[in-house]
Amino acid sequence: MRYADPSANRDLLGNRTLLFIFICAFALVTLLQQILYSKSYIKRGFQFGWQRGDQQANWTGLFNDSDSPTEQNITGSSSRYFEFYKEPLEFNSTRCLELRQEILEVKVLSMVKQSELFERWKSLQICKWAMDTAEASLFKSTLSRCCNAPSFLFTTQKNTPVETNLRYEVESSGLYHIDQEIFKMFPKEMPYYRSQFKKCAVVGNGGILKNSGCGKEINSADFVFRCNLPPISGIYTTDVGEKTDVVTVNPSIIIDRFHKLEKWRRPFFSVLQRYENASVLLPAFYNVRNTLVSFRVKYMLDDFQSRQPVYFFHPQYLSSVSRYWLSLGVRARRISTGLILVTAALELCEEVHLFGFWAFPMNPSGFFITHHYYDNVKPKPGFHAMPSEIFTFLRMHSRGILRVHTGTCNCC
């Protein structure tokens, strides 16, 4: 005879009970981690964009350590938890100094997750950027000693006399002999001098510019640098502006899209006309491959009786700039044209603003963006160190040396 076990259908600390206990424990641990480690809840919290005209709110837990006069707490019991800002905080306010330090304490990009860097950067946007004159002057003095853009940014008759054997930047064993014909292509001396322009805009081509509405602010700058013949007319003008004082041309564009200017030249001439009287800047002495095609741009504009000046980077300047940024941790086979222009702008301008510089697939709010504002073509991997360059710019922004624009603009 078989006897039934009266406890057979009971779940006394059985599988279901253990599973329930495990789920509860996991949830509790997760909650504790959020409370203890997530700065989103205690330190920086949720914030709303100034561009939409909303108030800024910081979840501050049970403390308020800010002494800025622009901050006002909500009345009532909730004032212990929320802190609202009706306008941006001063860059040197106590709260902003803390937020700036949170960027600066990250020495290398690999120290934090990308999402954490974005969060710190978003938090800093409640602060109204202001140039730190002492920091900027110190940084510019180091550039003056190492690179000296006012003397060596372009190849000139003054810094490269006739009969000079000019050494290429990359192919260090190669020399280019400067004869009388080539010498005549160079300007007599640098057309710009130190701190000549009050406010400069260096415009990159990043997808972060799309739908930014920054065109008017870019156009309001005293001097505007652009990289590699980007589109600026039609649907793009609202976001990127159209004012251009210097535009660089990568010779690979001429080689791939315009057949080295060996046949038809008018299509390329038409492209340059979109930049009106902007100076055209080429790396003719980067390597042997670039030289002849760069010279052809000068010949072409002369043939069409264009007034657009054509300048060539001085290879000594390019080498010096590369060594300088390498010493600051930017390691790449070649630094980007954008970084070269930013370096030059810091010497030629009192105040430097960057637009379109972003090297991540998402914007600071976590939304996917295209690589460029006009297409989504990715660069060859391993050639530039764009994330490292952008990270360096964010640190320079935090130090008050230059300003990086990554949001929408409300200028003018």
Curated annotation (Swiss-Prot):
Record keywords: Disulfide bond, Glycoprotein, Glycosyltransferase, Golgi apparatus, Lipid metabolism, Membrane, Signal-anchor, Transferase, Transmembrane, Transmembrane helix
S-S bridge residues: C200-C349, C214-C409
Pfam families in alphabetical order: Glyco_transf_29
Tissue expression profile of the protein: Highly expressed in brain. Expressed at low levels in other tissues, including liver, testis, lung, placenta and spleen.
Biological process, per Gene Ontology: glycosphingolipid biosynthetic process; protein glycosylation
A molecular function (GO) term: alpha-N-acetylneuraminate alpha-2,8-sialyltransferase activity
Subcellular location: Golgi apparatus membrane
Catalytic site positions: H384 (proton donor/acceptor)
Cytoplasmic side: 1-16
Annotated TM spans: 17-37
Pathway field: Protein modification; protein glycosylation
Uppermost EC category: transferase
Gene3D superfamilies: Glycosyl transferase family 29 (3.90.1480.20)
Parts of the chain on the Lumenal side: 38-412
Keyword Oxidoreductase annotated: no
Domain of life where this protein originates: Eukaryota
Functional summary from the UniProt entry: Involved in the synthesis of gangliosides GD1c, GT1a, GQ1b, GP1c and GT3 from GD1a, GT1b, GM1b and GD3 respectively.
Protein name: Alpha-2,8-sialyltransferase 8E
Species in which this protein is naturally found: Mus musculus (Mouse)
Gene: St8sia5
